Curated annotation (Swiss-Prot):
One function term, GO molecular function aspect: nuclease activity
Its EC number(s): 3.1.-.-
Summary of the function given for this chain in its UniProt record: Could be a nuclease involved in processing of the 5'-end of pre-16S rRNA.
Protein name: Putative pre-16S rRNA nuclease
Organism whose genome encodes this protein: Symbiobacterium thermophilum (strain DSM 24528 / JCM 14929 / IAM 14863 / T)
Localisation per UniProt entry: Cytoplasm
Main location: cytoplasm
Amino acid sequence: MRIGGLDVGEKTIGVALSDELGLTAQALEVIRRRSLEQDLARLDEIARHYGVVRWVVGMPRNMNGTYGPRAELTRAFMERLAGHSGLPVEAWDERLSTMAAERVLLEADVSRARRRKVIDKMAAAVILQGYLDARAARPPESFV
């Protein structure tokens, strides 16, 4: 059982996966967005190949906790993903996820060109790891 994490942007979707135990998140790939149908088809392929049972999608929020226009687009994407895949889809606060991913890549001395290629999947891993950590800290019945 794996959980998939997504960082949904206008041009790309960063994808991360949990390990089988649902303890750690690893960056998987960056999907270059072409059309909603192609995006959903690729996510279906990933779900089938890796045994994804749930998607966690980063929900953009302002620093004051409010939702902006990007959040509405993300909600619409989540609804389409849930309807298309038949899997549960949860929103998770993505505030500062890209900044955290950037910091990790800078500390690892990754070049600017390489950072640009991997930042979205790293942000997805940060989002998913936050979800997994919160899940581990709560009683199992709260995640039914």
